[in-house]
């Protein structure tokens, strides 16, 4: 479904900030670049799930709509029947889904942590082991904790609100060099007797050259989400129907990429055990009893591959979606039925991203010439592609109420679902 594709494209806006470690070099500039990568990763890990959480809820609720209408399923038929149609869903974005409170990555200083980065000879006081890049990163997170939560609270300001993938407007984390300098000098290691001057100078230089702005990119300013999917229902065998949804792998262009969607479901009649005349019916045209009850389970999957953005981020994403519901319908006569149902649904999205540092960070680090998005002489750009795996999950309880009307071989369906993400659904089905 296109909603899943929109989710994956939206997350790249923030995911391209994620860095990875590179081999430590001997210049402060290289340490600054490495710190920028690590801190960008921290920002994403602290805020990425909050940024995308409303979209995951939306996909879960929308993808798990328009499975059922009439609960009537004949126990046996003279020959198989088919319902072929298009099911469309319109979801509404509420204000609480458009923003979240961003988090500044930080870590409180603990002397016991230092053994991970640095080792000393107790007798001589000499350094025997040193991971400079990781030590700088650790100290930097200590500084963020001090500036946001510690004794120097206020030197680093965290934005009060940021846009989710459904909201709008970028949010910037501002890291003034003056504040960073004060926080480094206030760090316990700054005056630690065994801290060599060369290491202190290296850390100070790396921090001084550090970018002053990191951006959490805004969303797509969505007030509603629309999706449609072809659906086939085949029945019946022992009061059971088969549901099939399918969009074969197709290239939807530069914006979406290569996308595929499929689903399989089984619906079983409970009414056949309640109505004596249910087993004798040899057609599916219209229920003969006032009410019917059925239970249904559906499993769906999606996949997406795309290359997006100036930095050519490669995206691969797959989702598995489950739904189980109990629903009933009431025969009003004349081809009209009212129905309602309650369902439990779950989604898991596994994504892999391969990308480079954002262009604006590369400008601040001197990797790219200001205003240019491609390497030029003396400005090689980010040469180290990074890869990150992310997993998103959501569960939902949904109540649906609707009406279906049959006109000859054409059936129209309209319903509304209430849950964490409300959905209005419409179906148009041809029966044969």
Regions found by a protein language model. Give the residues of each.
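A subset of solvent-exposed loop/turn segments in beta-rich extracellular surface proteins, enriched
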Residues: 25-230, 235, 264, 301-312, ...
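Short loop/turn motifs that connect adjacent beta-strands in outer-membrane beta-barrel proteins
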Residues: 72-80, 95, 254, 272-293, ...
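Residues on the lipid-exposed face of transmembrane beta-strands in outer-membrane beta-barrel proteins
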Residues: 73, 84, 230-236, 264-270, ...
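Residues that define the transmembrane beta-barrel architecture of outer-membrane proteins
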Residues: 78-80, 223-228, 257-264, 289, ...
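Transmembrane beta-strands of outer-membrane beta-barrel pores
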Residues: 88-92, 246-250, 270, 297-303, ...
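Repeated loop/turn-to-beta-strand initiation elements of outer-membrane beta-barrel proteins
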Residues: 93, 239-242, 273-278, 335-338, ...
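Outer-membrane beta-barrel translocator/channel fold
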Residues: 280-284, 289-331, 345-349
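Outer membrane beta-barrel transmembrane domains
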Residues: 339-432
